[in-house]
Amino acid sequence: MIEKTGNILDSSADALVNPVNCVGVSGAGLAKAIAQRYPRWAAAYKAAARRGDIRIGYVWRHAADVAFDAPLIYALPTKRHWREPSRLEDVAAGLEALAVDVCHSEFPPTSLALPAVGCGLGSLPWGQVRPLIEAAAEKMDRSGVTVYLYPPGAL
C-alpha cells in the first residue's frame, strides 16, 4: 500500500473506489465528484441502486465510461441512506467484499485508488477505519494489486 496525497480523481490507478450509499444518490463529496466526471457511471450506479444491486457488504463495479483510459470504478456502500452516518461494521464488510472481488477477479486491476471510506461525510474516525483499509490492502497487495491510499482530506 502506498499513501498518496492530492485529488484521487487524478490518480493513474486502473481502478478507484467510490464510497456510496445504497439509494443511488451522489449529492456530495467524492461520490458527487465522480458523478460529475463520469455521468454514464453515475446513471448506471443509480439504476443499480433502484434494482437493489447496491447493498452493504457487497461491491458493484462498472467501467467509468466507454473511453479507453477511463478507470474501473468500484462502488463500495458505506451508508445505507445518504442521510445516515456510516457504520464501522458496514465499512468493514465492504472492504472485505472489495478485497475478495479484486483478488478473485478474472481480470483484476493492477492498481487501485482507495479513499478513506466512511470517514468524510460518513463521520467515522480515521483511526478506526485505517486498520480495516490496511487489512484489505494487504490482501490485494499479496494478489499483485498496488493499492494507493488517499487519507482524509485528499478529496
Roles of regions detected by a PLM:
Residues 1-155:
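Macrodomain-like recognition of ADP-ribose-binding/processing modules
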